[in-house]
């Protein structure tokens, strides 16, 4: 990972605790947005926006794009790497 990429992704995550919460939720198992929303106490519309941002950054992936109703998401290796990095840098 290059330094510029590192900083932009770390900044993306550091600006939103909810994005970090989504990644943490997906660490345990692959989930649909509704289940992630329950885990992080947010509605599925917001979760879908977080997932789009995380997907664009290649931190999560949709496992079944063709299914319009029950899309399962998974954290990528890149997502795990940056989640760990952000947690280490920003833990009190």
Question: Can you annotate each of these PLM segments?
Answer:
Residues 20-24, 81:
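Pre-recognition alpha-helix immediately N-terminal to the DNA-recognition helix
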Residues 57-68:
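Beta-hairpin "wing" of winged helix-turn-helix
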Residues 67-86:
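Basic, amphipathic "hinge/linker" alpha-helix immediately C-terminal to the N-terminal HTH DNA-binding motif
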């Amino acid at each position: 990972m290059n330094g510029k990429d590192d900083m932009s992704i770390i900044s993306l995550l550091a600006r939103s605790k909810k994005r970090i919460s989504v990644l943490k939720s997906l660490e345990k198992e692959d989930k649909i947005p509704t289940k992630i929303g329950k885990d992080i106490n947010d509605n599925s519309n917001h979760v879908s926006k977080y997932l789009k941002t995380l997907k664009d950054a290649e931190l999560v992936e949709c496992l079944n794009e063709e299914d319009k109703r029950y899309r399962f998401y998974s954290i990528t290796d890149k997502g795990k790497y940056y989640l760990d990095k952000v947690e280490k840098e920003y833990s009190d």
